[in-house]
């Protein structure tokens, strides 16, 4: 990941995956309301998606202060009326900032209805507790019918879907023993505990998956 003097960080994978992800989001996201992006990272996805999803309000977030600075920097280069400043959200917290209406008022969001949560490439580069926190938060925040969208590599049936994913998993675990490619069935089981129904799994380029849940 490269960082330029203007604070914009760049993740090369975003340029490769943003269009395929957008095509899925255009189909599965609600047409109105706030879409909360968890672990927005550099902010490149947010600035690409928001102007192409004009019916919704895109709210990025990240627990890392440097990532939030990058998100704000990208927003200055590519402003959009429906793109809001990033919030500091750690999914492992028992209460997220979006559960406090005054926090949304501060950034000018008058409509406090979060109708979807998007999380791209997080749960394999975070402790398992982050996945647990994500599901718990989505279960608390989303209304009935609300959408949770995940993107990234997953194991299916306890097995890697490609040799490249197996090697990636090994490299992740060498970097941090708490990281790793997650088993999709384990993720969906946790989701069920928080009233999140697995709607569909969509194969994506480079052996990734889009996984869609609905609050019920």
Task: Show the residue positions of the predicted features.
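Class I SAM-dependent methyltransferase SAM/SAH-binding core
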Residues: 36, 44-101
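A conserved beta-strand element that flanks and buttresses the S-adenosyl-L-methionine
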Residues: 118
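Class I SAM-dependent methyltransferase Rossmann-like catalytic core
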Residues: 1-32
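Core SAM-dependent methyltransferase catalytic element
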Residues: 196-216
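Conserved Class I S-adenosyl-L-methionine
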Residues: 161-185
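A short, conserved alpha-helix within the catalytic core of class I
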Residues: 125-138
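Conserved beta-strand signature within the Rossmann-like core of class I S-adenosyl-L-methionine
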Residues: 145-157
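Conserved glycine-rich SAM-binding loop
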Residues: 41
């Amino acid at each position: 990941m490269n960082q330029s003097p203007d604070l914009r960080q760049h993740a090369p994978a975003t340029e490769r995956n943003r269009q395929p992800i957008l095509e899925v989001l255009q189909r599965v996201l609600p047409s109105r309301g706030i879409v909360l992006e968890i672990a927005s990272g550099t902010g490149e996805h947010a600035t690409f998606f928001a102007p192409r999803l004009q019916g919704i309000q895109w709210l990025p977030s990240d627990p890392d202060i440097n990532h939030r600075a990058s998100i704000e920097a990208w927003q200055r280069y590519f402003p959009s009326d429906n793109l809001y400043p990033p919030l500091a959200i750690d999914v492992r917290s028992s209460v997220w900032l979006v559960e406090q209406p005054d926090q949304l008022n501060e950034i000018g969001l008058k409509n406090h209805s979060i109708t979807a949560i998007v999380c791209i490439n997080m749960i394999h580069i975070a402790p398992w507790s982050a996945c647990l926190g994500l599901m718990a938060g989505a279960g608390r925040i989303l209304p009935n019918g609300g959408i949770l969208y995940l993107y990234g590599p997953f194991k299916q049936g306890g097995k890697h879907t490609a040799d490249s994913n197996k090697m990636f998993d090994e490299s992740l675990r060498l970097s941090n023993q708490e990281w790793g490619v997650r088993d999709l069935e384990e993720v969906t089981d946790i989701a069920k505990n928080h009233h999140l129904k697995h709607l569909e799994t969509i194969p994506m380029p480079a052996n990734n998956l889009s996984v869609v849940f609905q609050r019920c």
